Amino acid sequence: MAILEQTLCLLKKDSKLLLALGKKGFNAGKYNGVGGKIRKNETPDQAMVRKVKEEIGVTPTSYGKVGYLEFDEYYEGEKRRIAMHLYIASEWDGDPMETNMFIPHWFHISDSPYEKMFPDDKYWLPLILKGKKIRAYFDYDKDWNVLYKDIYNMNQNVSVVIDGQAGSCGKGKICGYLSQIDQYKISTNNWSSNAGHTYVDNKGRKIVVSHLPMAIVNPDTIVCINAGAIITPEILFKEIKEYKDLLGKRKVYVHPRAMVIQQKHRDYEMASIRSGSTFKGCGAALADKIMRKKDIILAKDYFSNVHNSKIEIMDTAMLLNNEIGKILVEGAQGQDLDINYGLDYPNVTSRMCSAAQIIADAGLSVFGVKDIYMIIRPYPIRISNETNIGKTINSGDYAGSQEITWEEVAKRSGFKGNFEEYTTVTKKKRRVFEMNWDRLKYNVMINKPTQIVLNFAQYIDYRAYNCKDYAKLPKKVKDFIKRIEEETSVPVTIIGTGENEEDIIDLRKLKLNT
């Protein structure tokens, strides 16, 4: 869905507010602020000043941005999304005048004519008149009824996606879905080459990445790799080449302090590590970065010598913190693999995988976070005890849960085929375990997710496969969801029922409507 960027300005003097009565078109008979479309190569501030002068004959000289509104609405029978930069002006040159579009009127702020305004105005206008800066989203039906609304602090524009178990819960699918449905302006990650992320579009195309954010599937989302990333350049180059059609004209912004993996890091891990590992050199590279060794290579050094026209070195923290639009932070691996709070050390990964760590690696504040999506599956997994270099290791158990077979999972679900899963990076068969409710509650305690996403619902009952309607989900799946919510006190808002992007049931508007 394309986004139409607009501005809206309200003139305020002491306890009075200027609203303009529309004379024709979309605004006819409605009171509103004044504004309109942002032209190409025009900033929101420039567009706001221009439109106020055009529509009521004054030029704002002292003003501030107080909000960012998004609307999904119908226009000429088609759904469209409006993104509106909201301003209040306290000083201006000239006197408000009637034009061919509007008739300006002054109101006391306590007498705002909400009955003659758009239905959403009554929700957000009182807040900004009290001095609050807000972000809001409204979903309208064809009759201009508000179906769903979400209003929150303007500075809370960050959503985080984490894995609530030991990885392979379908983060790639959910990040791709969210990036398109929720229209994120920027997506960032701290990934390394020891984990892969998969997304399957509706045409069956499989996108698999270890470095590029999965938000590449949205052509309007800026993508960046932050300072917490540990990069294998060959893999990044391969992904840029393979998905050049998805990237289009976009750059991939990389923080100068992202770490680069060298062959010595892979060699060291193959010679030294005896616990579960992909032997991609990620842990060894991170250790060298922590020790500030002289022979390390950071992204700023590597990419200044090895040119790729798609990569641009940039302070991604500045990029993210200067963005007022929605930001998606894509996590990797899983909380059960966290080096400090994961399962059985040393059968963990080389760093923390919590929401707090992912946010810190992005260079963002926790106070900017609005949502944390924790992705889980009904049967958690661990990697194979057989490595991709021929070694047999102990990849760990699952907090005492019984290890079962993929045949047993299929039997319980009523599926006659084979559910066997293989890891994206090493191509080894995953081990599968019974759900551990105590472990899930522990991971919820660590991360405090606002929402839980349940993927692989078809593993509970195969009749859920490809289901897109909650009402049609088998009772067995609904009962499982109910137990998740009872055990964690966190709503299950998204349900994955298959591999493809369309195999999703999104309950957010139902469960989170405020």
Predicted regions and their residues:
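N-terminal strand-loop-strand
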Residues: 1-32, 60-64
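Unchanged
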Residues: 38-64, 71-128, 147-153
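Short acidic-hydrophobic surface loop/beta-edge motif
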Residues: 67-69, 73, 138-139, 197-202
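Charged phosphate-binding loop/patch that engages nucleotide di/tri-phosphates or the phosphate backbone
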Residues: 130-155
